[in-house]
């Protein structure tokens, strides 16, 4: 098949179709949705929360070994939606980059710098025929010394933007519609409201009530800027508060 034929646009990452599309990049976005996971991120006035559905594909798996939340440094967290193997590779490289940044400059890598680095790396993967785009959307969260709580989303095409709230993966548009209503008047959510808004969005989109073991919740707070994953007991408290409120 010649490079100019329709199939050629599908096979070669670096060739634009006559309509100006890069099919392999579009397929990377489809791979993210094909993972069947929905992720939510919400930024409050003094905290950031990310939530994702925790699916254990095999009953014999140890569910503590299944995660989509990764600490990059003590203060930066990453929620990966999509292909887990691609995510782990990206996370390891991001950790190396953050450690090198700390060694070179003497302070922690800011959230926006990490997001830009991930986006730059993803964009390079769209230029070379011997690489393929990563099938991962990464949400990066942390507290910026100057700007406070920060939430960024990086996609396989190399875009990265700061968000008040966002979603990735399956049913992401439905989640964004839900979040737009919640964020309409630019509310200043407390820590509890931030976490519960994120969990409520996931429940609303997937139309099910979760057990604490079925979701993962990662948070960073201004008064304690370390990234951490909530325990099942802490998640249970928020689920109870949501059910009582509703």
UniProtKB/Swiss-Prot annotation:
Its main location: cytoplasm. The keyword Nucleus applies. One of its GO terms (cellular component) is proteasome core complex, alpha-subunit complex. GO terms for biological process: proteasome-mediated ubiquitin-dependent protein catabolic process. SUPFAM superfamilies: N-terminal nucleophile aminohydrolases (Ntn hydrolases). Keywords: Cytoplasm, Nucleus, Proteasome. It is found in: Cytoplasm; Nucleus. It holds the Pfam family Proteasome. The 26S proteasome consists of a 20S proteasome core and two 19S regulatory subunits. The 20S proteasome core is composed of 28 subunits that are arranged in four stacked rings, resulting in a barrel-shaped structure. The two end rings are each formed by seven alpha subunits, and the two central rings are each formed by seven beta subunits. The catalytic chamber with the active sites is on the inside of the barrel. The proteasome is a multicatalytic proteinase complex which is characterized by its ability to cleave peptides with Arg, Phe, Tyr, Leu, and Glu adjacent to the leaving group at neutral or slightly basic pH. The proteasome has an ATP-dependent proteolytic activity. Belongs to the peptidase T1A family. This is Proteasome subunit alpha type-6. It comes from Glycine max (Soybean).
